[in-house]
Regions:
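Boundary/linker segments of alpha-helical solenoid repeat arrays
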Residues: 1, 33-41, 80-88, 125-129, ...
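"A position-specific structural signal for the A-helix of alpha-solenoid helical repeats
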Residues: 4-8, 48-51, 55, 62, ...
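TPR/TPR-like (Sel1-like) alpha-helical repeat modules
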Residues: 26-31, 74-78, 138-162
Length: 172
């Protein structure tokens, strides 16, 4: 639980353009990872390590080191892809592969971003946010048919829900 708090704060600070504010929380994540490793808890130490990797990648991005950030984020996503979810825990709030896709999209690489979002959906199906990102990436890469398919899936997933998202209404 502590790790999730530090991760959320670090990621939020880095993505808000305040990398210095993220660094103490990443230090705390590394400290927690080491304690878990010392306690021989390989699963949770690995999960916390991935969180630290993700947040560190976003710090690099916030510092304008985009190539390094993309490499670091790709490595974090690969590490998360190799782990299995613990049977008694919920999935991660936002998969590393999805965050990698967001970084790719932000870096002007919509085709690569789309591939990352599609990989996320294979492992973590029916994620509304991932569908939204995939639709945007498809649109930006010029694949309007695929974008429309994704927007239609979003509308179907949210059928009957109060629709306040203008992006979804614009494509339905």
């Amino acid at each position: 639980v502590q790790a999730m708090t530090y991760f959320a704060r670090a990621l939020g600070a880095a993505r808000s353009g305040n990398p210095e504010a993220a660094k103490p929380d990443i230090a705390k994540l590394n400290e927690l990872r080491d304690k878990l490793r010392d306690a021989k808890d390989a699963y949770w130490s690995g999960q916390v390590d991935i969180q630290a990797q993700v947040a560190s990648a976003w710090i690099l991005s916030a510092e304008g080191k985009q190539d390094e950030a993309l490499k670091a984020m790709s490595a974090a996503a690969d590490a998360e892809d190799k782990t299995e979810k613990h049977p008694v825990t919920p999935g991660v709030p936002k998969p590393a592969r999805e965050l990698y896709g967001e970084m790719l999209l932000q870096s002007g690489m919509p085709g690569e971003a789309l591939a990352a979002f599609e990989a996320t959906l294979k492992k973590e199906p029916n994620r509304l946010g991932t569908y939204m990102c995939a639709a945007k990436a498809a649109e930006k890469s010029g694949d309007n048919a695929k974008a429309r398919d994704y927007y239609e899936k979003i509308v179907a997933m949210t059928d009957g829900a109060y629709q306040t998202r203008t992006a979804m209404r614009a494509h339905s």
